[in-house]
């Protein structure tokens, strides 16, 4: 199956290229850019030399559909909302890595993203592509809203507790830390090497745009869920996310019950790895892979459960999950082309 990538020169775009070039079923028909049309991708990123030869093309839905069936949008918020109606109109399936189609309520999108929302008729067609929890909807979708990186790690950790109803609905606290690639390709003072090296920074306190998508998804599984407390930090690594979830249980529990809950929830999910009791993962152990690793603890003194969830923000948090969703759409095993061992060193 032929695919196209729009926004091919951003970090999400080049990760898609890396994965799709090694995929046994998908092949890249075309790469598209806004600012570097006519350039060969190897001139922009020399590490692709002798691997692929593609000239970056203009974005024309009528031309793209002549060769491709699926389009990946690795574009900033606001851009996808403008492009997607044209792509859907010519019969392309769209997997969008931006936040433009994650929120069902346009008012909430505008409140958190500070920009105009996509048209409601397009929003209504979008499926939130958290693969492990939305497989059946993804399978028949024409438009996938690929989840945010923080949201992916947070939801995979939180949903088993929320669905089971065993935690106090107003007790969810999520502390999240990300490598610098999560901030995107455009440099800022905050991501400048001297500012972040040997340092860490909290940012978007109570304002991060992944909050509403987390709350929206939690509410799908438990309408009693209340607003969450969510904080995000930049740490001096290139890629990787660690989320630490805290929540208070409604009644006394045994750690074995919680361990069993997670193991049974994800027993049919090949990319979710639950650590043995008392063991906890680190981002290095999933780097370069599509895995989400989790460890669970329970504090009898406080009645709180702690879940540690780690992913590679460029893989399970972006391009990897996008291809996982494409696999589901194409009727393939969802692991196809994604069975990379983590790059520990």
UniProtKB/Swiss-Prot annotation:
Q: Which reaction does it catalyse?
A: N-acetyl-L-glutamate 5-semialdehyde + phosphate + NADP(+) = N-acetyl-L-glutamyl 5-phosphate + NADPH + H(+)
A Pfam family cross-referenced in the UniProt record is: Semialdhyde_dh
EC number from the UniProt entry: 1.2.1.38
GO biological process terms, semicolon-separated:
L-arginine biosynthetic process
> Which GO molecular function entries does the Swiss-Prot or TrEMBL record give?
N-acetyl-gamma-glutamyl-phosphate reductase activity; NAD binding; NADP+ binding
To which pathway does this protein belong?
A: Amino-acid biosynthesis; L-arginine biosynthesis; N(2)-acetyl-L-ornithine from L-glutamate: step 3/4
SMART domains listed in its UniProt record: Semialdhyde_dh
Keyword Zinc tagged: no
UniProtKB keywords: Amino-acid biosynthesis, Arginine biosynthesis, Cytoplasm, NADP, Oxidoreductase
Q: Where's the active site on this chain?
A: 149
Q: Where in the cell is it found?
A: Cytoplasm
Q: Does the UniProt entry include the keyword Transcription regulation?
A: no
Q: Which GO CC annotations does the UniProt entry carry?
A: cytoplasm
Q: What NCBIfam families does the entry give? A: argC (TIGR01850)
Family of this protein: Belongs to the NAGSA dehydrogenase family. Type 1 subfamily.
Q: Which HAMAP family does the record associate with it?
A: ArgC_type1
Q: What does this protein do?
A: Catalyzes the NADPH-dependent reduction of N-acetyl-5-glutamyl phosphate to yield N-acetyl-L-glutamate 5-semialdehyde.
The name this protein goes by in its record: N-acetyl-gamma-glutamyl-phosphate reductase
Cite the source lineage: Bacteria, Bacillati, Bacillota, Bacilli, Bacillales
